[in-house]
A protein has these predicted regions:
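A bilobed periplasmic-binding-protein/Venus flytrap-type ligand-binding module shared by bacterial periplasmic
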Residues: 19, 81-90, 95, 173-188
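A conserved helix-loop-strand patch within extracytoplasmic ligand-binding domains
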Residues: 71-131, 164-166
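Ligand-binding cleft/hinge of the Venus flytrap
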Residues: 15-27, 106-126, 205-212
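Beta->alpha turn/N-cap motifs
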Residues: 11-12, 35-36, 47-59, 71, ...
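Short, well-ordered beta-strand elements
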Residues: 1-9, 29-32, 94-97
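Pocket-lining segment of extracytoplasmic ligand-binding domains
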Residues: 125-211
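Short helix-initiation/N-cap motifs at beta->coil->alpha
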Residues: 30-41, 120-139
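Secondary-structure end/capping motifs
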Residues: 184-251
Length: 266
């Protein structure tokens, strides 16, 4: 029986699954595509077995989750697709419009506003990802994914949250990783995910060229994003960044506990 693999339907996920889509790596997965928050919900509801979910969801899991070693979606500076868009100084933000597609970015925005910039948030508003509408109803907006990547930044005051996090903490930020219940995937399945990542990183230019055919920028723009802004490893620095993130989220009451990070190989 195929392992149901929850896949985020964003450009930055493509290098992790391109090899599966193109038949370049043997696997036993059924690929199920959704936005990050829905991937997390489907994993929670056991509609998928393993999924690429926002890191914050590891701390909110109904039972301990394990993660696949060595594969994630992270940044070590500007990420170019996770933004806090402002109509006033960060310290003066009182209301925040949230694009609920990604719970990690929502939690990160609150950590940065409250702990780094000293804002006193009074209210958050769930919203569809339309920047102008969001800013009509709030002091700031969280905008993520392909919409953020293609945002005309000259029109707005923008904080790149990946850059703000790393400048503040000196650590990478991990947005998502392959996650599931303890025995949902075996060593062979984990190895397939690692091989798919390695293969995908060799095909970034081809991925970018195919994506550019239906999007406003050229392949060079998208290739630079995938190869420079996004990092797909999950090393010691990334794990330290995750732990710091969980600790801050716990301090703000966004999660009830700081989880232990367990790998499938353990």
């Amino acid at each position: 029986m195929a392992i149901r693999l929850g896949v985020v339907s964003y450009l930055n996920t493509k290098p992790l699954v391109h090899a599966f889509e193109m038949g370049e790596v043997d696997h036993d997965f059924e690929l199920v595509y959704d936005v990050p928050s829905v991937c997390a919900r489907k994993l929670h509801d056991q509609d998928t077995d393993v999924a690429l979910i926002p890191a914050i969801e590891i701390a909110r899991a109904p039972e301990p989750y394990s993660i696949v070693e060595g594969v994630g979606i992270a940044s070590r500076g500007p990420v170019r697709s996770v933004f806090l868009v402002l109509n006033r100084d960060p310290a003066d933000v009182r209301t925040l419009a949230l694009d609920t597609s990604s719970r990690s970015s929502v939690a990160l925005s609150r950590i940065l506003l409250q702990k780094r910039f000293g804002a006193h948030l009074e209210d958050t508003i769930d919203a569809e990802p339309d920047v102008d509408v969001m800013l009509d109803n709030a002091d700031a907006a969280v905008v993520i994914g392909d919409i953020a990547l293609e945002l005309d930044r000259s029109r707005y005051r923008v904080v790149d949250m990946g850059d703000a996090w790393t400048e503040w903490t000196g650590l990478p930020f991990v947005y998502a990783c392959w996650t599931g219940r303890k025995y949902a995937i075996d060593r062979e399945g984990c190895d397939a995910l690692v091989r798919a990542k390695a293969s995908g990183l060799l095909h970034v230019d081809a991925i970018a060229e195919a994506y550019a055919a239906d999007h406003p920028y050229d392949a060079v723009f998208y290739s630079a994003y995938l190869s420079q802004a996004i990092h797909y490893g999950l090393g010691d620095a990334e794990l330290e960044g995750m732990h710091r993130y969980f600790a801050y989220a716990n301090e703000l009451g966004l999660i009830d506990r700081v989880p232990t990070i367990d790998f499938y190989s353990e």
